[in-house]
């Protein structure tokens, strides 16, 4: 994207916990204490669930989903609700219109709005954001399947409750901020663990190996 273009940064996206932790890790490395950012995000979430009660309802359904069908249905409801919300990302600098964690941003921020080519026998289309039309070659494209597979691999965990291997669910950034500030699920421990693993496991495995820009 062009420097200063933040059209996609005024939408609500769902990301995985590992992505959120990596963005927080990057913010602390670049700007210091992240507590204020988390508090702002938590306040935004509290306001959003008041304006959009279906947002918290969809999130709760996802959290308590017991099978793939109910999870997919609730995820669809969450996506539909998020699509109606236009609000700046907590990591967007309102003065410069620049991302404060650009090198640590989630995957969706790395390909949303950029060109992509669906690989399918019955699809012959090349998509590109009209804000970024300056000429694109196939070498500029990244393999989203590889990135997605790596993200899933890094998000796997063993669930004692279900005695099965599961992966982190997708939630809005603001909801993760709420979880951190409310002290739910011992997120501070997860954050400290992620700081130790982020460079060696997360960045090297996913971003630096498969996405250079």
Each model region followed by its residue ranges:
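Short loop/turn segments that flank or connect secondary-structure elements
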Residues: 1-213
């Amino acid at each position: 994207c062009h420097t200063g273009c933040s059209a996609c940064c005024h939408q609500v996206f769902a990301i995985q916990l590992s992505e959120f932790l990596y963005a927080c890790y990057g913010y602390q490395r670049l700007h210091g204490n992240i507590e204020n950012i988390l508090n702002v995000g938590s306040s935004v979430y509290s306001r959003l669930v008041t304006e959009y009660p279906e947002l918290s309802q969809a999130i709760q359904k996802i959290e308590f989903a017991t099978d793939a069908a109910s999870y997919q249905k609730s995820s669809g409801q969450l996506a539909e609700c998020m699509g109606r919300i236009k609000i700046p990302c907590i990591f967007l600098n309102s003065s410069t219109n620049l991302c404060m964690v650009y090198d640590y941003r989630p995957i969706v921020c790395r390909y949303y709005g950029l060109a992509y080519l669906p690989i399918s026998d019955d699809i012959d289309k090349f998509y590109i954001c009209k804000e970024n039309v300056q000429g694109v070659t196939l070498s500029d494209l990244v393999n989203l399947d590889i990135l997605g597979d790596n993200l899933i691999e890094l998000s796997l965990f063993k669930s004692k409750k279900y005695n099965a291997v599961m992966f982190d669910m997708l939630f809005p950034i603001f909801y993760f901020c709420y979880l951190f500030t409310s002290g739910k699920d011992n997120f501070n421990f997860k954050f400290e663990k992620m700081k130790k693993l982020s460079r060696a496991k997360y960045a090297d495995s996913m971003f630096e190996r498969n996405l250079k820009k």
